[in-house]
Amino acid sequence: MVKKVNKSEVRIKKHNRIRNRFSGTPTRPRLAVFRSNNHMYAQIIDDTVGNTLVSASTLEKGVKAELEKTNDVAAAAMLGTVIAKKALEKGITTVVFDRGGFIYQGKVQALAEAAREAGLNF
């Protein structure tokens, strides 16, 4: 009998494999992305200390007010520009992109490309 595959477990396994390859440092922190069915979240993390340096999500009032929907590609692109602006204000210019086990397409790709256009290097 074929066992049904749980997609979230597969994504978590992929994310753990990715996390074993790299981690955020003070000079080059990690840009971690998480997307749920309704919202997207992005954090810039220094893994040596375990601190979140910058965070943004589609739940924030400023972001949510400008968006028609919080779970589409346009929302992801706006989140990318917001996280990049916050990072540049804190003096963070280069990051390591952690897609969180999600496939690099659609919302994740839109967030990454918008962050690059706003000035983050990765």
From Swiss-Prot:
Entry keywords, A to Z: Ribonucleoprotein, Ribosomal protein, RNA-binding, rRNA-binding
Pfam family, one: Ribosomal_L18p
InterPro entries: Ribosomal_uL18_bac-type, Ribosomal_uL18_bac/euk
Keyword tRNA-binding among record annotations: no
SUPFAM superfamilies, alphabetized: Translational machinery components
Task performed by this protein: This is one of the proteins that bind and probably mediate the attachment of the 5S RNA into the large ribosomal subunit, where it forms part of the central protuberance.
Record note on quaternary structure: Part of the 50S ribosomal subunit; part of the 5S rRNA/L5/L18/L25 subcomplex. Contacts the 5S and 23S rRNAs.
Protein name: Large ribosomal subunit protein uL18
Organism: Lachnoclostridium phytofermentans (strain ATCC 700394 / DSM 18823 / ISDg) (Clostridium phytofermentans)
